[in-house]
Amino acid sequence: MKLEWPTIIFMLAMHCLAIVALQPQYWSWGVIVVFFFLSVLTGCLGVTLGYHRLLSHRAFKTPRWLERFFATCGALSAEYGPIEWVTVHREHHKYSDTDLDPHDINKGFWWAHFGWMMVDVPALEDKSKLAPDLVRDPYYMWLHDYYLWLQLPLGLLLYSLGGWAFVLWGIPLRLVAVYHLTWCINSVAHTWGTQPLDSGDNSRNNPILGIIAFGEGWHNNHHAHPSSAKQGLQGQFDLTWYIILTLEKLGLAKNIRLPS
C-alpha cells in the first residue's frame, strides 16, 4: 500500500491547529456559535443530507440549485469532493465489511476510523463507474478539483468577522470535529450497538451517534434499507430526516424513498 502523504500531512496539520484553537485566549461565545453553525452547515446539511442521503443514495430529489448548495456545504467539510465521497460510499455498500470494503471494520477499528484514507484507495480508480451521475456534471467536477480551496474564502470571511479565533474554531477545530463524527459511523457504528435488522454485515444502531451524528447513528437501519431517506425508525431521533420532511413541506424535496 502506498502512503498518501498529502492527506497525512493535511490531517496532522488540522489536528495540531485544532489543539491551538482550544487555548484559552481563543475562547468566546462568538467562536462557539461559529463552530456549531458551521458544523451543522457542513456536517449535517453538507455530508449527511447532501453527500450521503441525496447524492450517494438518491433517497430524495431536490431542485438542481439546492442539490448543488448541499454539495457545496459538503465540500466545505473537506471530506473529499462529492465525486470521491460518493464513490467510496457506494463501494462501501457494495462490499460492506468484506476485504473489498474501503473501510472494512474487520481490518481493525482504527483502520475503519481513519487509517484507510492514509493509503491509496483502490475504489477511487472507479469514479466513472461508481459515480457516473456526478462525473458528467461540470459543477461536481469543479468541486472535485477545488474543494480544499473553498476553505480560503471561508477563512477570509471568518478573519474579517472575528480574527484568528474565528478562523481556528471555524476551520481546523470544526473540520476535526466533523471528521471524527463521520469516521465514527465507519468504526463505532460497525462495532458497538444493536442489530435489530438483518443487514448482512456488522452495522449497528448506536443511540449516542444517532443523536450527535444527525441521525446517521441508526446505521443498522441504514444498511438494511440503504436507499431510504429516513434512518431513524420507530421514534428514533433523526435530525436529517426532519430537515428532509421540512424541505418536502416547502416544496423543495420530492420522490422521498422510505424503508420497504
Residue locations for each model-derived region?
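Non-catalytic, topology-defining segments of multipass membrane proteins
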Residues: M1-C184, S228-S260
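Catalytic glutamate of the conserved HExxH
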Residues: R53, S187, T191, H223
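Active-site-proximal inter-transmembrane loops
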Residues: C73, A131-P138, W192-W218, H222-H225
